[in-house]
Design a protein with these regions (language model features):
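Active-site groove signature of glycoside hydrolases
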Residues: 1-14
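Alpha-helix N-cap/helix-initiation motif
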Residues: 8, 16, 156-159
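Glycan-recognition and catalytic cores of secretory/periplasmic carbohydrate-active enzymes
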Residues: 14-21
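Conserved alpha/beta catalytic core and glycan-binding cleft of carbohydrate-active enzymes
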Residues: 24-226
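Short, intrinsically disordered, charge-balanced linker/junction segments flanking boundaries
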Residues: 222-237
Length: 237
């Protein structure tokens, strides 16, 4: 399986311009042809925040043909239910129905208003026509942990029992489960955002930008690890 990062940022106007296939649909068809020649399954998994099942709808039916896509809404609902955090994009998931809805229909925002984005977001998923295995569910990822100010895993905020309950919910769901590295044994080490830019100005800009970003959420500059510092990398390996 090959994961395609942030496919919502791929700009391809081919379908609108001349009726051709979108790049992702082309990749899907090429991968299917290769899988047939090799006589083994090959999968493309998309990271997309569009909340649109067109991503995993077959190309023949007008979709993009991905084997599966990440389901961030499931993560968000689980995270809020377990930790009680409701800042930033977690705000809408404080809704008591969020967990039930995401565990049955993958997307919480399926045409509803997203306060974080300031607009209506997503489209409904019909479980009768879109299989649950098309959605990848998880309690932690490199993004959701690494993009926290100190890279703390969810286990730093909840009890082992709560973490086990959260794991049970996504492992036993209708979705394809994904276990984050170290989660299987309850690793307590952080996964901090680290970089190795050789350009001093670029490195400084990243470090300062990260501190400024988290300052808006109440973190002081001294609390946010410097991405360019080797100790930040060492703390995560």
């Amino acid at each position: 399986a090959l994961r395609l990062d942030a496919v919502h940022e791929l700009k391809d106007d081919t379908p609108d311009r001349d009726g051709g296939l979108h790049l992702l649909a082309e990749l899907s068809e090429a991968t299917a042809a290769l899988a047939e020649r090799l006589e083994r399954p090959l999968d493309l998994i998309a990271e997309s925040d569009l909340n649109d099942a067109t991503m995993v709808t077959p190309v023949a039916d007008g979709g993009l043909g991905m084997s599966a896509q990440w389901a961030d809404d499931v993560h968000h609902a689980l995270h809020v239910a377990l930790t009680g955090e409701t800042q930033g994009y977690y705000a809408d998931f404080a809704d008591p129905e969020a967990l039930t809805k995401t565990l049955t229909r993958a997307f919480f925002h399926d045409g509803s208003f997203s306060t974080f984005r300031g607009e209506e977001w997503g489209a409904p998923v019909d479980p009768a026509t879109v299989s649950g295995h098309r959605f990848v569910a998880y309690l932690q990822t490199h993004d959701q942990v690494g993009n926290r100010a100190t890279g703390d895993r969810i286990g730093a905020s909840i009890t082992p029992g709560q973490q086990a309950a959260g794991a049970a919910l996504y492992l036993l769901s209708a979705f394809t489960p994904m276990v984050f590295m170290g989660e299987e044994w309850g690793a307590s080490t952080p996964w901090q955002y680290f970089t190795d830019f050789r350009d001093p100005e670029m490195g400084r800009a990243v470090s300062e930008g990260r501190r400024a970003e988290f300052a808006e959420h109440g973190w002081t500059s001294g609390e946010v690890p410097d991405p360019q510092d080797e100790s930040t990398r060492d703390a995560s390996v």
